[in-house]
Amino acid sequence: MSWDSYVDNLIAQSKDASGTTHCDKACIIGKDGSAWTTMPTSDTSNNLKLTPEEMANIAKCFKSKDFAAFMSSGIYVNGTKYQFLREEDSKLVLGKKKGEGSLTLQSSKTAIVIGHCPEGGQQGNLNKAVGVIAEYLESLSM
């Protein structure tokens, strides 16, 4: 099964009423730290590029529901450190880096959906789009 179409759907879901897209890149990883979407070899793809170490660290925090590592060391995605803003219900994590944009990470039963909002975009639209995909996966017991 190709999960890359879910990234395209997530990006489309982030559009506001004027048609502006508030998500430029996204990916889905498993709670076991595996890549579900294709990890691109360049930055030209809509898919976020995470290293195996970044995926493992993110998965570990969500699986254990312990976000202390994010609080103390930040959230690393594509080699960039994002400041941890908050977590909600051990399922949703928000991060931000000035000049880079913001991150929304939301887990389902077996997956973590990660979206990136470019600087100047509306993270609220990103949160909604990530939530739609994560909740859909949850409804499939995934």
From Swiss-Prot:
Biological processes, Gene Ontology terms: regulation of cellular component organization
Gene3D superfamilies: Dynein light chain 2a, cytoplasmic
Record carries keyword Cytoplasm: yes
GO molecular function: actin monomer binding
Superkingdom field: Eukaryota
Location relative to the cell: Cytoplasm, Cytoskeleton
Signal sequence, renumbered to the chain: none
Annotated tissue distribution: Expressed specifically in coelomocytes in response to injury.
Main subcellular localisation: cytoplasm
PROSITE patterns in alphabetical order: PROFILIN (PS00414)
SMART domains documented for this protein: PROF
Keywords on record: Actin-binding, Cytoplasm, Cytoskeleton
GO cellular component, one term: cytoskeleton
InterPro entries: PFN, PFN_euk, PFN_sf, Profilin_CS
Record-stated family: Belongs to the profilin family.
Protein role: Binds to actin and affects the structure of the cytoskeleton. At high concentrations, profilin prevents the polymerization of actin, whereas it enhances it at low concentrations. By binding to PIP2, it inhibits the formation of IP3 and DG.
Subunit relationships: Occurs in many kinds of cells as a complex with monomeric actin in a 1:1 ratio.
Entry protein name: Profilin
